[in-house]
Structure formats: C-alpha cells, structure tokens
C-alpha cells in the first residue's frame, strides 16, 4: 500500500540521517557498513546461550503478567510498568548480573529482584520455575525522549522533561551499557 511504501522510505531516510550524525569514522552509508565480529559464545559461558534463553523465558512471564495488568486498565504499555521478580537465590543471582540493565531486557521502566519466599499472593506464577512476577503501574513521570518512567525527571534544569539517562545521552558522554 501507499502507506507502507511511504513508511519504508521514511525508515530508510532516518537510518541514513542517524548514521550521518554519529561521531567517529565510518562507511559512507549505513547500508555499506560491516557488522562487528562478536566472540563465539556457548552454553557454558556465564552469559552464553543458557543465560539468555533463561532471560527470554523470564521476559515471557513478565509479558504475560503485564498483559493481565493491561487488560485490567492498570497500565497502557510496558514502559508504564515497574516489575518485581520474586525468584530463587540461584535465579536471582543470575539476573543480578544484568544490574540496572534488567529493566531494558524486560522493556519496563523499573525492575527489582526479591526473594521468592517474600512474594505476595497476587504475584503471578509463570512458566519459569522458581519465579513469581508482580507488575505495578509506575507513579513516576514519563521521559519525553525515551518514554521510561523515572523518578529523576524534572531534576535537570537544562532538560526538565528528560530522565538522567537521556540527559547523559543528549548533553554528556552518553550512557554505558554492557548487556542490553
């Protein structure tokens, strides 16, 4: 359709526009660039296939819990949500390696880990053994740039509608992420 054709053209233009404004040397076009060679990973690596398969399974359980909240009208989208994962110590230790980036893997505004024994009755049991999920609507303001709901919005005079992460990305050195 005409709409699809127009949207595809816009995506192409935006990719090139972003590419032109990235710092550093690079190929003339995003479509002429090469991908980085990543080191091989296997299931025995600390953050190998087994780790990421488990993270995806946890995310599926979180998505299921968010759908229930969405159906009840408590949240509109995943970035409106904060999530508490009540997990066994083994699962909790594994997920703790992601640090603050757990919320990016889950695509939520907030993510906390807690002991499985502390799970309230309303926490949902999913497919991942040793995990219960509690989703709640975030009370924080929504960042105009990334749409995450963060408590620090309004704390930056030069960017009053942005979260700290976005201020760092817009005016500072840029955030450092390791996993997600």
Spans of features found by a protein language model:
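Cys/His-rich metal-chelating microdomains
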Residues: 149-152, 169
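A glycine-rich helix N-cap at a beta->alpha junction
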Residues: 101-114
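Acidic, turn-prone loop/beta-hairpin segments
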Residues: 6-65, 69-96, 112-134, 161-162, ...
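Cationic, low-complexity basic patches in intrinsically disordered or flexible, solvent-exposed regions
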Residues: 3
């Amino acid at each position: 359709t005409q709409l699809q054709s127009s949207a595809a053209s816009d995506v192409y233009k935006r990719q090139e526009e972003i590419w032109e404004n990235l710092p550093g040397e690079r190929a003339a076009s995003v479509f002429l660039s090469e991908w980085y060679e990543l080191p091989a990973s296997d299931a025995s690596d600390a953050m190998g296939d087994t780790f990421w398969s488990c993270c995806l399974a946890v995310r599926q359980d979180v998505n299921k819990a968010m759908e229930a909240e969405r159906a009840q009208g408590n949240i509109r989208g995943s970035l409106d949500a904060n999530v508490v994962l009540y997990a066994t110590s083994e699962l909790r230790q594994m997920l703790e390696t992601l640090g603050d980036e757990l919320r990016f893997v889950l695509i939520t505004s907030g993510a906390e880990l807690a002991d499985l024994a502390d799970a309230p009755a309303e926490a949902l049991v999913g497919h991942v053994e040793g995990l219960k999920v509690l989703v709640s609507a975030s009370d924080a303001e929504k960042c105009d740039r990334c749409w995450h709901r963060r408590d620090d919005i309004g704390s930056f005079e030069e960017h009053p509608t942005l979260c700290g992460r976005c201020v760092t990305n817009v005016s500072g050195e840029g955030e450092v992420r390791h996993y997600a």
